[in-house]
Amino acid sequence: PTDSKYATFPSVSAGWVVNKEDFLKDVKLISYLKLRASWGANGSKSNLPGNEDKELWTLAGIRYPDATGTYQSGAQISKLVNKDLKWERTEMADIGFDLRLLNNKISFTADWYNKNTENLIALGTFPMSTGGGMPFVNAGTVNNKGFEFELGYTNNDNEFRYGASLNFSTLKNEVTQLDVNAPVAGASVRGYNLTWFEEGQPIWYFKGYKTDGIFDNKAEADSYNTKYGTTF
């Protein structure tokens, strides 16, 4: 939007190569050890299609009678605009270390991260009486946090060289704040909304009915019908 074209997104990082210190220089087991930490912010409008700063009108099929009964051409808004829309802002903190052992043959990396996205851009939910296409809104705040680990092995001693690695990660995703009046609907099939943006839940989680399973045979269906008075 025209009112929020520019923003500032700073970042900072620091690292310490520990194996270069005097107390580790003579430790042959450790080839490399680095402790690191970083914090940064960035902006995004990737969820936003073009021309969202423009209000669109349509003339097609818009007619109304005047006082004499003569029909005149008219116009109506076909897409609303949200001039207060702001950048998505993501702040991420990361703490980790890189370790290599036995002449760089064995490597291990570990990270903890906490990523917080504010003013997440999503299509707004408004009363049907509003009319026209719904504008995008800053829908809320999403938090992602977890751990990442990678263990690797590299053999460079022979003509035949090879390497292998194993990684593992965890992720907790949650909508921590909802800035609109109701949950925001996402993808839909045949008119039914399948995914939702709702406070206290993972972002765009699937929402539907729980089932007790399926009938494996006619006897199970007959038993259910007898118990609940249905006609499956």
What are these regions (language model features)?
Residues N167, Y205-N217, A221:
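Exposed, low-structure sequence patches enriched in small/polar residues
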Residues N156-R161, I214-D216, F232:
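Generic structural signal for short, solvent-exposed loop/turn connectors between secondary structure elements
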Residues P1-F206:
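Extracellular/periplasmic, surface-exposed regions of secreted and cell-surface proteins
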Residues D222-F232:
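Short, intrinsically disordered, charge-balanced linker/junction segments flanking boundaries
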